[in-house]
C-alpha cells in the first residue's frame, strides 16, 4: 500500500514539475500574461463567496 501511495505521489510530482516548466508555443506567446494569471482565478471565486455572504449579512 505504501509503495502504491509513494508511486502516485512521485508521478504527480513529476507531472506538476513538467507542467510548470512547459512553455507556450511561439504562436501563443502573446497569451503568456493571461496564462500566468489563470491559476489564481479559483481564488477569486472563493473571495467572491465571502463578499457575497457579507453582502447578505451572513444569513
From Swiss-Prot:
It is found in: Plastid, Chloroplast thylakoid membrane. The keyword Membrane applies. GO terms for biological process: photosynthesis. It comes from the Eukaryota. It holds the Pfam family PsbK. Keywords: Chloroplast, Membrane, Photosynthesis, Photosystem II, Plastid, Reaction center, Thylakoid, Transmembrane, Transmembrane helix. The chain crosses the membrane at residues 38-58. The keyword Membrane applies. Residues 1-22 form a propeptide. GO terms for cellular component: chloroplast thylakoid membrane; photosystem II reaction center. One of the components of the core complex of photosystem II (PSII). PSII is a light-driven water:plastoquinone oxidoreductase that uses light energy to abstract electrons from H(2)O, generating O(2) and a proton gradient subsequently used for ATP formation. It consists of a core antenna complex that captures photons, and an electron transfer chain that converts photonic excitation into a charge separation. HAMAP family: PSII_PsbK. PSII is composed of 1 copy each of membrane proteins PsbA, PsbB, PsbC, PsbD, PsbE, PsbF, PsbH, PsbI, PsbJ, PsbK, PsbL, PsbM, PsbT, PsbX, PsbY, PsbZ, Psb30/Ycf12, at least 3 peripheral proteins of the oxygen-evolving complex and a large number of cofactors. It forms dimeric complexes. This is Photosystem II reaction center protein K. It comes from Oenothera elata subsp. hookeri.
Amino acid at each position: 500500500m505504501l509503495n502504491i501511495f509513494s508511486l502516485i505521489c512521485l508521478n504527480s510530482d513529476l507531472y506538476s514539475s513538467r507542467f510548470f516548466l512547459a512553455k507556450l508555443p511561439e504562436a501563443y506567446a502573446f497569451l503568456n500574461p493571461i496564462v500566468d494569471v489563470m491559476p489564481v482565478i479559483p481564488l477569486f471565486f472563493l473571495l467572491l463567496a465571502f463578499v457575497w455572504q457579507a453582502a447578505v449579512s451572513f444569513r
